[in-house]
Amino acid sequence: MEFSMNATVEQLAPVEQQATAGWVVAALYQFKEVQDPADLQQRLLDLVKTINLCGTLIVAGEGINGTVAGDREAIDTIHQFLLNEGFNAMEYKESHSSDKPFRKMKIKLKKEIVTLGVEVKPRDLVGHYLDPKEWNELIARDDVILIDTRNDYEYKAGTFKGAIDPKTETFREFPEYVKKELEQHKDKKIAMFCTGGIRCEKSTSLLLQEGFKEVYHLKGGILKYLEETPPDESLWEGECFVFDGRTAVTHGVEEGANIKCHACGWPLTPEESALPSYEHGVSCLYCIDKTTEKQKAGFRMRQSQIAAAKHKRL
């Protein structure tokens, strides 16, 4: 198979519907040199064909990143495989989902395991890691600039008290935000956070590369914070958007109350999904005026097809 590092190669493995109650969800990443990413992708594909997993793993020359779900045995199998491959310093977190959180199992080959679009070296240059207690102490200070490195729709579901929203739609836009909004604050303490920690590996590396002096980030990201921090000690407000069928999680990494608008992808609170503007898979208050009636008709057709497919499987 020919491979260009600028291309995305995606291979799928079949996933059977799990009969057991609940799914173990494992979020993981590690920046580590991978000599032959295409070979690792193929061996991962061979493995996941033999176990019941769903989710996505991204393989690149700089490491591995992804979230997968399955039964206990399947998760332990993929975890041990990666450990045997030398990924023994993974940022690794587990949670649970009552429903199947992903439709398929994907193994993707990419240039970056998280796409910033600017060359940085997080294995060599990265911000100061803080555990949840240290994080609370830092962001309570008045001389700290607290930045949410996630995208606008993620910020909408929840964030830390006092955090700045860069209003980015993709992580690729973050370097431009730094150039326009942070350049004059190189002498300030900068604290950044993201869902699982991987985006902050690159964002803190970027800032240090650009000459910022005091750059901090939350080790393990929001997910680790919600797992370890009691609600009465937490500075988190709202829910944490996740890229799977749960939409968002809250303290204890328990499934939250938000649902996702499948037309635009934005998270909705129970109050927002009760509004007349919400039609499942068709519209919500954030997108109802941004699509045509023809597009809405197409969305309704898609929902009918999905419902028919589900009925056929029963």
Swiss-Prot record:
GO terms for biological process: tRNA modification. GO terms for molecular function: oxidoreductase activity, acting on paired donors, with incorporation or reduction of molecular oxygen. Residues 140-234 form the Rhodanese domain. Keywords: Oxidoreductase, tRNA processing. It holds the Pfam family Rhodanese. It comes from the Bacteria. PROSITE patterns: RHODANESE_3. InterPro entries: Rhodanese-like_dom, Rhodanese-like_dom_sf, TrhO, TRHO_N. The active site is at C194. The keyword Ribosomal protein does not apply. Gene3D superfamilies: 3.30.70.100, Rhodanese-like domain. It catalyses: uridine(34) in tRNA + AH2 + O2 = 5-hydroxyuridine(34) in tRNA + A + H2O. Its EC number is 1.14.-.-. Belongs to the TrhO family. Catalyzes oxygen-dependent 5-hydroxyuridine (ho5U) modification at position 34 in tRNAs. HAMAP family: TrhO (MF_00469). This is tRNA uridine(34) hydroxylase. It comes from Acinetobacter baumannii (strain SDF). The gene is trhO.
